[in-house]
Amino acid sequence: MNIELVKKFTKDHLKGEKTGHDYYHGQRVANLATKMYLSDYPDAHKDSRIVAIIQTESYLHDTIDEKICDNPDEVIDEIKELLPKGGFTSLEIEDILFIIQHMSFSANIEHHYQLPLSGQYVQDADRIESLGAIGIARAFTYGGKHGNKIYDPEIKPEKLISHDQYRNHVETTINHFYEKLFDLEDLMNTPAAKKEAHRRTE
């Protein structure tokens, strides 16, 4: 499996991204997801196919994110062309595409998708990236880029019940912590992630 092709693809597509969803976010997610998987499965080899799949999903997940991608369907078609060149099987490609299209927080507000094991680690790592020091930095970077206020007592946190509400409601960066980030610990899938999310939330 040629992960370098995936890394280059991600770098090219996220070049200039400045809201905390750049190539280096994908790299951190890949490193953390791999670390957590190997912690939960100590007999697994770091060069196994599932680790390569975990890293691939980690790097690719934000290349199709509607927050930063104007045409996700077009990028999905590019990924379908890319992955066979990297040595992935048709079944692996099917899983990778399902995971990167269904792992986001917004995709799971109205319906919870049960992801294959690799996707559970990537989803957990992506959410953990929103916690702790790096998570705070990313939240304020994203809020500033989109012109959100840091705090406004007249704008109350909302209970998120739909994708459209999540994308379109008026929020402040402080509210984002109460609407989403403080609840992420309870959404973890895997043993290692539950421990790390608890540590960062505390």
Model segments located where?
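Hydrophobic, well-structured mid-protein blocks that either form specific transmembrane helices
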Residues: 89-123
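His-Asp-centered metal-binding catalytic motifs of divalent-metal-dependent phosphohydrolases/nucleases
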Residues: 47-69, 75, 97-106
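Short alpha-helical hairpin
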Residues: 1-11
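An active-site-proximal "capping" alpha-helix that borders the catalytic cofactor pocket
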Residues: 29, 73-85
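Divalent metal-dependent phosphate-bond-processing catalytic cores, especially two-metal-ion Mg2+/Mn2+ enzymes
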Residues: 14-23, 27, 31-46, 60, ...
